[in-house]
């Protein structure tokens, strides 16, 4: 599968095409390459759409470091194109490690549905997540309940980029629990302490974002991610 910039259960290989075998794992595409513009960008999204929702179930949509004030026509097209091939769109929202006023975050949840359509936005990617204290956990719990009740049971993905506690584990459907270089991932990986991350039954709820992956590291990174329940 030739996809660049993908989270696979999770792998991000920069701008190099990913060609490893990922059986029983999946990818999430961060939509950081602008949807239209140049030949390279068009080729990127053509590759994503050819792969389809069977191999790339989700794409993270980030029109303006978040939803922005008005709909972006290029992202409207991208969102529709993703939807047409079975790729679910996740709206990108920062929480600033749960210090951003939660009403602002909730307003962004609503704004994605207003601007891009409740039937086209399938969930949310909450970035800059902390799991370090009771406040952070309570914040995430409130946000999780809001999405499920107000937005219509949309998917919640949270990106702490590091290991989480068992206390916060119930408050996202998927967690990104590692965001490191391939070198660190393969040589200096810190083992998780939570029961959640150490349970293979939770592999479908755990993703790892590994950057600076060279082709000769693909198989080793994939093997390691499987062993680490991602």
Where are these regions (language model features)?
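Glycan-processing catalytic domains of CAZymes
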Residues: 4, 10-230
């Amino acid at each position: 599968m030739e996809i660049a910039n993908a989270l696979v259960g999770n792998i991000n290989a920069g701008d190099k095409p990913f060609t490893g075998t990922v059986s029983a794992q999946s990818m999430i595409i961060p939509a950081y390459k602008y949807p239209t513009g140049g030949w390279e960008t068009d080729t990127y999204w053509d590759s994503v759409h050819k792969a389809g929702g069977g191999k790339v179930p989700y794409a993270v949509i980030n029109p303006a470091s978040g939803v922005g004030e008005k709909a972006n026509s290029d992202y409207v097209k991208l969102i529709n194109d993703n939807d047409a091939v079975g790729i679910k769109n996740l709206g990108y929202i920062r929480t600033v490690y749960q210090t951003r006023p939660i009403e602002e975050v909730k307003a962004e949840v609503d704004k994605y549905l207003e601007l891009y359509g409740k039937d086209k936005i399938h969930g949310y990617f909450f970035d800059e997540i902390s799991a370090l204290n009771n406040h952070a956990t309570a914040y995430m719990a409130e946000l999780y309940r809001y999405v499920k009740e107000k937005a219509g049971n949309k998917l919640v993905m949270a990106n702490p980029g590091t290991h989480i506690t068992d206390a916060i584990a119930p408050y996202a459907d998927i967690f990104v629990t590692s965001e490191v270089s391939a070198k660190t991932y393969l040589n200096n990986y810190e083992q998780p302490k939570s029961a959640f991350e150490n349970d293979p039954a939770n592999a479908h709820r755990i993703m790892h974002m590994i950057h600076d992956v060279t082709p000769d590291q693909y198989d080793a990174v994939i093997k390691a991610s499987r062993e680490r329940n991602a």
